[in-house]
């Protein structure tokens, strides 16, 4: 058991804005000067660690700054593989797997469904660029007889021009046999993409959703004609009944200082008398368990660093070197709220696995249909109830597969220049290649 009095948590919200998060980080370091001015603490008051952020770009900016002060950053959702670079982010850790692992999972799905002719679109930011790079490297290195061909590979931004989106959609339409789109986008960019795709009259594609937007029906609201199916990957969602009970209790208290209660009342039209309506509608984000894992990683590290038992600590925070905390975080090992064994590798990342989800059009809900780990992909497609000629998913190949016992005949022409006569002669050659 760890000493539960170790942590004082100061919460700040900076959304996806890197500049705002840098300002918040600076405020954390300036708090010490404010407390000193008020005369309520010693000069040894210091920020121990920062939990967050969610967006990879924001986390990179924050970790770059706080690393100068030897303050660890533990993210619960940032997956960019760039954050694994210890020469840049020496004090960074995360409780979710990196894009490298997600790329392996996506590639496994492509081969499982024999999708060998695909389109890759990504946010033009750290999350998208990093993810696509990892995916293309994984596809290239994947050992298989049939290679995956990426026919469209484009970055987009919701702050970009309309011309760029039009160009991308026209390029997609040049490959009618490519029916699978891997959308490696952060949530706001995914919302933007589907709105633009609807205006461009994109129809009946299969989308592979990455962990940033899978699970959200808001992304595809009003865009059901664009996709035939959506299948996606995300770290496992863990049931948190104690957290749900605490959240509901907080709503019932109707604390005017609680911004979350206020927002819930606005969105669900709740009041003191009808707050029970929130019980069935409000649910915690799937990353809550990973946030708690990040917080407890710091707690376990401080517990060991300060030589604590359940009641007291042998050492004082003011007497230890803050630079040592990172190494204690590196060495933690415990069973987390995510039901995973939490420990960090040399890149500051935990091991990971993914659940596979499918968006059921009839119910507008995501259904878990499988799981992926580094050892195996397991699918249960019987849970998908969507009849049709392409059940469960359409083909996405450059040509039709041959019948059993036949092979593809490739015919190509070779131009040969005769140096003596100066004439160009055409020779037809044939090559047989089995599928």
Task: List the predicted regions and their residue ranges.
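Flexible loop/hinge segments that line or gate small-molecule binding clefts
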Residues: 77-91
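Short, conserved non-catalytic motifs in the polymerase core
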Residues: 90-96, 276
């Amino acid at each position: 058991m760890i000493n539960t009095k170790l942590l004082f948590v100061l919460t700040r919200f900076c959304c996806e804005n890197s500049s705002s998060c840098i300002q918040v980080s600076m405020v954390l370091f300036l708090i010490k000067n404010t407390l000193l001015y008020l005369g309520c603490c010693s000069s040894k008051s210091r920020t121990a660690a920062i939990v967050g952020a969610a967006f990879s770009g924001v986390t990179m900016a924050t970790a770059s700054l706080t690393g100068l002060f030897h303050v660890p950053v533990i993210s619960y959702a940032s997956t960019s593989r760039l954050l694994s670079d210890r020469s840049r982010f020496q004090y960074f850790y995360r409780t979710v797997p990196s894009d490298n692992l997600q790329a392996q999972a996506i590639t496994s799905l492509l081969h499982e469904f024999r999708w060998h002719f695909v389109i890759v679109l990504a946010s033009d930011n750290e999350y998208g660029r990093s993810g696509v790079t990892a995916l293309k490297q994984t596809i290239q290195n994947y050992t298989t007889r049939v290679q995956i061909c990426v026919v469209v590979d484009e970055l987009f931004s919701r702050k970009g021009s309309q011309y760029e989106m039009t160009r991308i959609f026209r390029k997609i339409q040049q490959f009618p046999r490519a029916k699978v789109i891997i959308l490696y986008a952060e949530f706001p960019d995914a919302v933007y993409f589907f709105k633009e795709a609807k205006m461009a009259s994109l129809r009946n594609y299969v989308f592979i959703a990455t962990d940033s937007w899978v699970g959200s029906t808001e992304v595809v609201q009003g865009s059901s004609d664009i996709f035939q199916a959506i299948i996606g990957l995300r770290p496992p969602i863990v049931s948190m009944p104690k957290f749900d009970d605490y959240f509901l209790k907080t709503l019932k208290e109707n604390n005017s200082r609680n911004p979350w209660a206020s927002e819930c009342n606005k969105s669900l039209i709740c009041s003191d008398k009808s707050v029970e309506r929130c019980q069935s509608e409000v649910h915690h984000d799937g990353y809550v368990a990973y946030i708690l894992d990040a917080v407890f990683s710091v707690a376990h590290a401080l517990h060991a660093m300060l030589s604590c038992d359940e009641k007291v600590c042998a050492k004082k925070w003011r007497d230890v070197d803050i630079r040592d905390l990172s190494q204690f975080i590196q060495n933690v090992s415990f069973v987390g709220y995510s039901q995973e064994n939490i420990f960090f590798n040399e890149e500051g990342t935990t091991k990971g696995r993914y659940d596979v989800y499918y968006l059921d059009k009839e119910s507008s809900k995501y259904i878990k249909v499988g799981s992926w780990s580094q050892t195996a992909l397991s699918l249960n497609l019987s849970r998908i109830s969507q009849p049709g000629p392409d059940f469960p998913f359409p083909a996405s190949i450059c040509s039709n597969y041959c019948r059993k016992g036949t092979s593809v005949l490739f015919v190509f022409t070779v131009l040969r220049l005769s140096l003596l006569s100066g004439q160009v002669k055409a020779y037809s050659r044939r090559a047989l290649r089995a599928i």
